[in-house]
């Protein structure tokens, strides 16, 4: 019986060398980190600058508070975003991209271009394309 590798439809016969040698496929690693509903869109919003939970919820219609909180925690755990808590009453929490998170910008730009091409329509104005956004 052929071995089927987790997270893929690959069998031993057609497997990528990464799987055969026990190495982690870099593409699979990124997919594992970002393959959750809303994660990419949260990052898109954080490229516009530091955001509070309410601002993110407003920008992501359909995303529940519970789901957003879970995604933010996952991204923070992986070092992609910062969570800054300010000692105020009521407490203020703001999220921003880490240096590691900012490395994702070229990928998001490529996704934006591909999506625009596939939609065959004029794309939205996006600060990702102009290089604007957080430093």
From Swiss-Prot:
Record keyword Manganese present: no
Annotated ranges, domain HTH hxlR-type: 25-123
Source organism (scientific name): Synechocystis sp. (strain ATCC 27184 / PCC 6803 / Kazusa)
Gene3D superfamilies attached to this UniProt entry: Winged helix-like DNA-binding domain superfamily/Winged helix DNA-binding domain (1.10.10.10)
Protein's UniProt name: Uncharacterized HTH-type transcriptional regulator sll1512
Domain of life: Bacteria
InterPro entries: HTH_HxlR (IPR002577), WH-like_DNA-bd_sf (IPR036388), WH_DNA-bd_sf (IPR036390)
GO annotation (BP), single: regulation of DNA-templated transcription
Keywords: DNA-binding, Transcription, Transcription regulation
Coiled-coil parts of chain: none
Gene Ontology CC annotations of this record: protein-DNA complex
Matches recorded under PROSITE patterns: HTH_HXLR
Classification via PANTHER family: HTH-TYPE TRANSCRIPTIONAL REGULATOR YODB, TRANSCRIPTIONAL REGULATOR, MARR FAMILY
A GO MF term: DNA binding
Entry keyword DNA-binding: yes
